[in-house]
Design a protein with these regions (language model features):
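Short cysteine-rich clusters marking metal-coordination/redox-active sites
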Residues: 200-203, 220
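Residues immediately within or flanking Cys/His clusters that coordinate Zn2+
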Residues: 151, 197, 217, 223
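Conserved non-catalytic scaffold segment of RNase H-like nuclease domains
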Residues: 2-116, 120-128, 143, 147-165
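Short cysteine/histidine-rich zinc-coordinating motifs and their immediately flanking basic loops
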Residues: 211-217, 231-232
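Short, flexible, mixed-charge glycine/proline-rich loop motifs
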Residues: 185-197, 210-213
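Short metal-binding segments enriched for Cys and/or His
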Residues: 224-232
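Acidic, divalent-metal-coordinating active-site segment for phosphoryl/phosphodiester hydrolysis
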Residues: 166-179
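Conserved beta-strand -> loop -> alpha-helix junction used to position metal-binding or nucleic-acid-contacting
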Residues: 125-138
Length: 232
């Protein structure tokens, strides 16, 4: 149960694995949180790394879905004609997520902006849930990759991408990716990313050796968001 009265600030971004969370995904009419609308929202509730519940619905955006969006997500006007509006869906989604940490791919730059906007617009609520962006984790685990799209990660791990770009399918794909990224971060994965690396006690990201005026020191990889340092 989320306490609506207590939420006066947005949750923070975490850069670590958590075993209990709701992984969610939105499909939209376009890429702008200023002008575009949600047309599908899905989520999977996870406990101890296992999916225990699902949430998924199409959403009527009250406008025509551009061809370019339909070409990507295969959602067309006739599919959402009888779907509920997002204003009706949000209280149901809020009940589903409760106080859980939210997880998703590229959500810091995209999905969270839509959620923040619409929770404030329709419910007068500042969403307080902390969140983890698997794109950020992928940058930590695979710093040399050129692209870290969800499909790239799924292909790397041998996870099926059939049905990609529909929200619930993407959620299930991303959930498997998140669990495997978690193993990478703990040193149990396909590559030991923690070799010779410490973890920042402040934000959970990796510490790396940096050079300063007075020689080498440990600095958080989350810099400039996190400025924690340690002497070597």
């Amino acid at each position: 149960q989320v306490d609506l009265q207590m939420s006066n600030k947005r949750g923070k971004q975490l850069n670590k694995y958590v075993p209990d969370y709701v992984l969610f995904d939105l499909e939209t009419t376009g890429i702008s949180a200023n002008y575009d609308e949600v047309i599908e929202i899905s989520g999977v509730k996870v406990r101890g790394g296992k999916i225990i519940d699902e949430f998924s619905t199409l959403v009527n955006p009250g406008r025509t879905i551009p061809y370019g969006a339909s070409a990507v997500n295969h959602i067309y006007d006739e599919m959402v004609a009888d779907a509920p509006e997002f204003e009706e869906v949000l209280p149901l989604f809020l009940a589903f997520i409760g106080n859980d940490i939210l997880v998703g791919h590229n959500i810091a730059a995209f999905d969270m902006k839509f959620l923040y906007r619409d929770f404030e617009k329709y419910m007068g609520l500042i969403l307080p849930n902390d969140f983890v962006d698997t794109l950020r984790l992928a940058k930590i685990v695979f710093p040399d990759w050129k692209h870290r799209r969800l499909g790239d990660l799924a292909n790397y791990y041998g996870i099926s991408t059939v049905g990609a770009h529909r929200a619930l399918t993407d959620c299930k794909m991303n959930q498997k990716v998140f669990e495997l990224l978690g193993k990478e971060l703990s040193g149990e994965g396909t590559m030991d990313v923690r070799q010779n690396v410490k973890t920042c006690p402040k934000c959970g990201m990796m510490m790396v050796k940096r050079k300063g005026k007075f020689g080498e020191f440990w600095g958080c990889k989350g810099f400039p968001d996190c400025r924690y340092t340690e002497n070597i």
